[in-house]
C-alpha cells in the first residue's frame, strides 16, 4: 500500500516520520499531532500541563470535525500511525493500536480491538471486538472481522476469512 514490503516496516520500532506533517493541508497528521500533544500535556500534569491539554483537546475536536472521525483522546496508539484519507474513522476508547499501522477511510474499530504492529486496514473495514490482529496482518476493504487474525495473514470478506495465511 505504501510501496514498502512487510520486512521493511517494523512491527516493534515506531517510524515517527510516518506521522510527520508533509504539507499544509494534511488533516490526518494534524489530528494525530493534536492527540499526541494532548497525551503529552496530560502526562506532564501541573497548571501548565492542564492548560496545554485543554488547548490540544480543542485542537483535536477541530480536526476530528474536519475529518469527521472519532478517535478518543486516551486511546493507546503506537508510534507511526498513518491515517490515509482520515474521514469517517471511528476508534473505540478501549482499542489499542500497535506501531506503524495504516488505517484508511470509513474504518471502525468497535470494542476492545488490539492491533499488532504494522497492520494495514483497508477502506470501510469493520473490526468488531473483542479481538486481536497479529503483526503484519492486512485487513481487506469492507471486511467485517469478528475473530482473531493471526500474524502475517490477509483477511477479506463478510464475514472476514483468511485468504492468505
Regions found by a protein language model. Give the residues of each.
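Terminal amphipathic alpha-helical/low-complexity segments used for targeting or macromolecular assembly
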Residues: 1-68
Amino acid at each position: 500500500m505504501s510501496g514498502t514490503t512487510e520486512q521493511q516496516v517494523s512491527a516493534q520500532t515506531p517510524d515517527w516520520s510516518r506521522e510527520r506533517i508533509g504539507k499544509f493541508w494534511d488533516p490526518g497528521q494534524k489530528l494525530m499531532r493534536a492527540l499526541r500533544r494532548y497525551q503529552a500535556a496530560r502526562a506532564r500534569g501541573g497548571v501548565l500541563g492542564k492548560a496545554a491539554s485543554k488547548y490540544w483537546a480543542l485542537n483535536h475536536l477541530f480536526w476530528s470535525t474536519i475529518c469527521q472521525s472519532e478517535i478518543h483522546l486516551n486511546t493507546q496508539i503506537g508510534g507511526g500511525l498513518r491515517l490515509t484519507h482520515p474521514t469517517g474513522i471511528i476508534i473505540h476508547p478501549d482499542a489499542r493500536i500497535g506501531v506503524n499501522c495504516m488505517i484508511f477511510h470509513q474504518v471502525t474499530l468497535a470494542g476492545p480491538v488490539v492491533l499488532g504492529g504494522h497492520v494495514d486496514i483497508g477502506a470501510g473495514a469493520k473490526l468488531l471486538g473483542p479481538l486481536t490482529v497479529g503483526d503484519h496482518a492486512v485487513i481487506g476493504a469492507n471486511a467485517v472481522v469478528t475473530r482473531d487474525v493471526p500474524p502475517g495473514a490477509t483477511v477479506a470478506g463478510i464475514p472476514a476469512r483468511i485468504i492468505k495465511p
